Amino acid sequence: MLSCVFSDTIFLSSFLAVTLICMTTALWGTILLISKQPLLSESLSHASYPGLLVGALMAQYVFSLQASIFWIVLFGCAASVFGYGIIVFLGKVCKLHKDSALCFVLVVFFAIGVILASYVKESSPTLYNRINAYLYGQAATLGFLEATLAAIVFCASLFALWWWYRQIVVTTFDKDFAVTCGLKTVLYEALSLIFISLVIVSGVRSVGIVLISAMFVAPSLGARQLSDRLSTILILSAFFGGISGALGSYISVAFTCRAIIGQQAVPVTLPTGPLVVICAGLLAGLCLLFSPKSGWVIRFVRRKHFSFSKDQEHLLKVFWHISHNRLENISVRDFVCSYKYQEYFGPKPFPRWRVQILEWRGYVKKEQDYYRLTKKGRSEALRLVRAHRLWESYLVNSLDFSKESVHELAEEIEHVLTEELDHTLTEILNDPCYDPHRQIIPNKKKEV
């Protein structure tokens, strides 16, 4: 099937155009995301709509149709830049909130575009059908000329981001610092604006004005979950954008639905634009779920693992407190009736499977119906007791907490005491022997 699909030159032009456009939008979408204005692409895409219509009308009635793409791109970019100027004016002069300014430009320019589209529909139905693709996208109509334009814009974007990378990064992250360094921030902001407008205008026929902003946001959002380094985010974002464009284009051609009209099954081609956006959204969703650093699933697993480890350590401390009271052989009844078990687990029954895990790890040894701590388990329990009492001492002596309120806090943070932190606390507290409740703090050799 792949060979049949890619042997079609018409599809190949559309495939390359959509893929390159999605990669370019992902690159500049990363810049918008880092500069905390991801919704700017939404406003600029809607602002370009009347410009696209004016360009199409100019090409239809004033100039030759062969030059239509030039005038459409020119007037579309002009309208987009003009819309950005109004956003800046409303924010700086009228003191309007930025989100309000974005919404104002979006609805006003889009309304003007709808009015122009109504005029075109009455005066030239053929032209209306052609320009209607700008609103919802029609990737199947993209030919060699559009693919060439997409390649030029992509290569120009790569060159601009490579040549002015440091300047754009500094301007994006800290504009005041960039001004202090003597950088011409207005120049680099204008450069970014021109490229973003150019990408929007050259890409609206692929996914449409309504959906193109998703291709600015989704790939960069997914890439941001995987790295903190901007250069890596740019590469991953472009990769995700390219994968989304390629998959969406291929699925729209390779898989068709069949609608029953009357008594006949009519093939229905899936729209490319929405499929591209769905693929980008799925990739971003997977990154949000499974990102090694901040993915929801990974964080959920970490929380569950920490909660499980904390309960296991509490069980170990229960064993130690009972054995510390001269009861070496511990029955199930002694265990669940101890005050420490009641403090940690309340009325819960004896956690046999958890104790079996402690036994498997070599912390506890079972002899007939009794349990006893091993040397390894006693050492680990003393480490936890030392951590708890060190934290209590630090909270009382260094942070002026009352000794009545530090027990619960120490119960939470005793599980995160590393060797380095133990050494630091020991130095700060001058290696104390007793905690605020006059209980002995085990030494570093795990001895009391």
Swiss-Prot record:
A single GO cellular-component term on record: ATP-binding cassette (ABC) transporter complex
GO molecular function, one term: transition metal ion binding
Record keywords, A-Z: Cell inner membrane, Cell membrane, Membrane, Transmembrane, Transmembrane helix, Transport
Annotated localization: Cell inner membrane
Principal subcellular localization: membrane
GO biological process: response to zinc ion; transmembrane transport
The keyword Chaperone belongs to this UniProt entry's keyword annotation: no
Role according to the record: Part of an ATP-driven transport system CPn_0346/CPn_0347/CPn_0348/CPn_0349 for a metal.
Family according to the record: Belongs to the ABC-3 integral membrane protein family.
Protein's name according to its UniProt entry: Probable metal transport system membrane protein CPn_0347/CP_0413/CPj0347/CpB0354
Species assigned in the record: Chlamydia pneumoniae (Chlamydophila pneumoniae)
